[in-house]
Swiss-Prot record:
This is Protein archease. The keyword Lipid metabolism does not apply. One of its GO terms (molecular function) is metal ion binding. One of its GO terms (biological process) is tRNA splicing, via endonucleolytic cleavage and ligation. Belongs to the archease family. It comes from Danio rerio (Zebrafish). Component of the tRNA-splicing ligase complex required to facilitate the enzymatic turnover of catalytic subunit RTCB. Together with ddx1, acts by facilitating the guanylylation of RTCB, a key intermediate step in tRNA ligation.
Length: 162
C-alpha cells in the first residue's frame, strides 16, 4: 500500500488542489498489528524527512495541510538508530501532546553524525478534524526491526505502533 485512501470532502479536495503535489518517497509495509514505514531519499537527510512525513501521512492526508506555521525540532541520540527514534518521537510529540501540529513538509537542516544530533523544521498548521481527514493514530515509535541503510540511496525502515 503506497498511499492511504482517505475519504475527502469537496473542501479538502479543493484545498489539495491549491498546492503542488507532495513528492512521497515512502511506502507502508504490512506488519502484524503495526505498520512499517519504508522511506528513502537521495541523502540520509531526505530519508529522515520522508520517514517523518510517512508517519504523518498515516494520520492524515498531508496534502490537505497548509504551510501556515513553522515548527523547529532538535533531537539527539546515542547512535543513529536512537537519533532516528528521538527525531520521530519529538515530531510525534508536536502532534499528539504539544500543539497538535501537523506538517505539510519536514526539512532536516543538519545531521551531526559525530554527536548524533539533528535539527529540523516543519511547515504546516494545527490539526483540525473539521479540515483534515482523520487517518489512524500513531501511538509510538518502536526500535523493533529499525534499519538505517546509508547507501547511495539511503533507506530507512521503522515500525510505528498504531
Amino acid at each position: 500500500m503506497n498511499d492511504r485512501e482517505l475519504d475527502l470532502t469537496e473542501e479538502q479536495k479543493a484545498l489539495k488542489a491549491k498546492y503542488p503535489p507532495i513528492t512521497k518517497k515512502y511506502e507502508y509495509l504490512d506488519h502484524t498489528a503495526d505498520v512499517q514505514i519504508h522511506s528513502w531519499g537521495n541523502s540520509l537527510e531526505e530519508a529522515f524527512e520522508q520517514c517523518a512525513m510517512g508517519m504523518f501521512g498515516y494520520m492524515t492526508d498531508t496534502e490537505t495541510v497548509e504551510p501556515i506555521d513553522t515548527v523547529e525540532v532538535e533531537s539527539e541520540g546515542d547512535d543513529m538508530e536512537s537519533l532516528l527514534y528521538h527525531f520521530l518521537d519529538d515530531w510525534l510529540f508536536k502532534f499528539s501532546a504539544d500543539i497538535f501540529f501537523i506538517p505539510r513538509e519536514v526539512k532536516v537542516l543538519h545531521i551531526d553524525r559525530m554527536r548524533y544530533k539533528i535539527r529540523s523544521i516543519g511547515w504546516g498548521e494545527e490539526f483540525s478534524i473539521n479540515k483534515h481527514p482523520q487517518g489512524t493514530e500513531v501511538k509510538a515509535i518502536t526500535y523493533s526491526a529499525m534499519q538505517i541503510h546509508e547507501t547511495e540511496q539511503p533507506e530507512i525502515f521503522v515500525i510505528i505502533d498504531i
